[in-house]
């Protein structure tokens, strides 16, 4: 079996601890997210396309919750020669260590400052692009408005926020069918019923999805005047908001 294959929840566990981005997860994260999040590769690639169009010379880019650096790498490939700086932040030391290894594997003239820290503590300024790629959902709900407000204040006029999230639906039948289709997606990618069940239990207390309308209301309330959901597959979506 490949050491980078996600088998974290493949064995029966009497006690399921809350999910955390520790060294075990960091070691298999690329496999885990590819097999768990429909459209993840497209989202990553398109973040690079957004960067190509929105990142201005001599500005900063923020990847908040950068994990292994997939979005940062996608952005960096598209903004060569613009004298920009990418600030990539994650609060998991294990993720940051592996992210640095991934960044070191490619030569670039774009500086990346990699920070192990809490995204809520990061000062944002002179930003032309901010990315929250499946990150906001792990923050306590009461902290989300303040982070979006900080991002809005730190973005330059015309700057872009890319926000990707697992979402929920107020409409119960829609929630049920899209959630089941997502589970079918995971089954098709080789996850067993045991793995699906145990991971759901691990995430229950740490990931709290919002509805699309909640996201839009939050963004509008903080000042964003342009908003769209550019991608959705089942109960996963990626949104853009322009200042």
Swiss-Prot record:
Keyword Ligase: no
UniProt-listed Enzyme Commission number(s): 2.1.3.-
GO aspect biological process, one term: tRNA wobble uridine modification
InterPro entries on file: CmoA (IPR005271), Methyltransf_25 (IPR041698), SAM-dependent_MTases_sf (IPR029063)
Top EC class of this enzyme: transferase
Pfam families in the cross-refs: Methyltransf_25 (PF13649)
GO molecular function: carboxyl- or carbamoyltransferase activity; S-adenosyl-L-methionine binding
Residues bound to S-adenosyl-L-methionine: 40, 65-67, 90-91, 118-119, 133, 200
Keywords from the UniProt entry: S-adenosyl-L-methionine, Transferase
Domain of life the protein comes from: Bacteria
Gene3D superfamilies referenced in this protein's UniProt entry, alphabetically: Vaccinia Virus protein VP39
Reaction catalyzed: prephenate + S-adenosyl-L-methionine = carboxy-S-adenosyl-L-methionine + 3-phenylpyruvate + H2O
Biological role: Catalyzes the conversion of S-adenosyl-L-methionine (SAM) to carboxy-S-adenosyl-L-methionine (Cx-SAM).
Quaternary structure note: Homodimer.
Family designation: Belongs to the class I-like SAM-binding methyltransferase superfamily. Cx-SAM synthase family.
Entry protein name: Carboxy-S-adenosyl-L-methionine synthase
Native species: Shewanella oneidensis (strain ATCC 700550 / JCM 31522 / CIP 106686 / LMG 19005 / NCIMB 14063 / MR-1)
